[in-house]
């Protein structure tokens, strides 16, 4: 496959309403390589559409897909819906969820410092 014909990858976002999560939404909204297909959030945001959540960034809200925020409790059963996960979760929440997703074969990109010790280890 040439770089001009890359297939679009389905991605999930962990975090819905925080600044980092909204920055991810902004970056993913028009990205040519990614399609945002699922967003997972806190119990406070579960069941709400992304467009219902207060927008905190100074830039205007991007055109977002019509997605309803899902519960983190359902994420492992949803892993067939996406292959890449971007995480804006706080470290204490991210630790277990991200580890489980990686074990299920998802590529996980995290903003949390939770797995820093793993990144510092030799993997050769």
Residue ranges and their predicted role:
Residues 2-124:
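N-terminal Rossmann-like NAD(P) cofactor-binding subdomain of oxidoreductases
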């Amino acid at each position: 496959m040439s770089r001009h014909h890359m297939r679009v990858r389905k991605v999930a976002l962990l975090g819905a309403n925080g600044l980092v999560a909204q920055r991810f939404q902004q970056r993913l909204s028009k990205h040519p390589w990614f399609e945002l297909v699922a967003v997972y959030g806190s119990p406070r945001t579960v069941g709400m559409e992304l467009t219902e959540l207060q927008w905190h960034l100074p830039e205007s809200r991007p055109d977002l897909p019509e997605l309803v925020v899902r519960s983190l409790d359902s994420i492992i059963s949803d892993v067939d819906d996406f292959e890449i996960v971007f995480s804006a979760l706080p470290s204490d929440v991210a630790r277990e969820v991200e580890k489980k997703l990686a074990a299920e074969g998802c590529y996980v990109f995290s903003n949390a410092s939770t797995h820093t010790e793993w990144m510092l280890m030799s993997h050769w």
